[in-house]
Amino acid sequence: EALCLGHDIGHPPFGHAGEEALEDAMAHAGGYDHNAHGLRTLTRLESPYCDHDGLNLTWETLEGLAKHNGPVSAPGWALEEIDRAFPLELSTWPSLEAQVAAIADDIAYDNHDIDDGLRAGFLDLDDLLALDWLADQWRAVEKRFPHAPRDRQLRELVRTQIGLMVTDLLTHTREQVKGVGSAAEVRAAGRQLAAFSPAMREHERVLKRFMYDRLYYHEEQMETARRAHDVISRLFAAYH
C-alpha cells in the first residue's frame, strides 16, 4: 500500500507535461526526475519528527519506490545521492510487492484512461472494437446484459478488462515464483516475477499503442499539454 500511494508523489502538476517542463527548465542542473524527487520528499522534505528528517520509512519501501520499474542502470545525480544515504541495491530487481505495485499502476491507468477518453469524446465504441480482444469482451458484455444502457455496458467492459488483467497477473505470477523461497531470491532472480503472461503482455502492448495513437497524441490533448508546459515553465522562471 505504501508503494502504491508513494510511487508517484514526486509528480509535478499536470503530470508528464509538467515533468517535461521541469526537465527542460533544470537541464543545466541535471534535469528533473519525479521518482528521485518523490524519494527526496519522503526522506528529507517531509519532516514531522524532531530528531530526524523524512517519514522514517522502511528500507524495503524506499527500495521499492526507487526501482519499482526494475533495476536502475543509470541513476541520475538525485537518485545517486539518495542511494548513498540509503544503499538501495539499484542493480537488482525489487521486491515482489514493488513489482506488483508497478503492474497494478499499469492496469489502473490503462483502464482509467479508456474511461477518460470515452467521457471526453476522444474515443467511442467503434474505436475500442477495432481491437480484437476488446471486441470479444464487448460481445460477451452485450450477451450477458443485452438490455443495459450503453454507458453501463461500456463501464462493464472496462471492469471486465480489469478483472481479466488481474486474474492473468495472479495466475502467471504464481507460476513464476515457484521455487523462489526468499526475498533475496526474488532480487537475485534476474527477471520480473510479478508479470503478465506473454499473451496478456501482447494485449497490453497493442492497447498502449492504440491509446497513444488515439488519445495521448490527440490534438486537443496535445494542446492541453502545451499549455501545461507553458504554465510550469513560467512559474519556474518567476520563482527560480
Explain the meaning of each model-derived region.
Residues 1-24, 28-29, 42-46, 50, ...:
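Acidic/His-rich, divalent-metal-binding segments that scaffold phosphate/diphosphate chemistry
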Residues 32-36, 41-240:
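Histidine-centered, transition-metal-coordinating active-site segments
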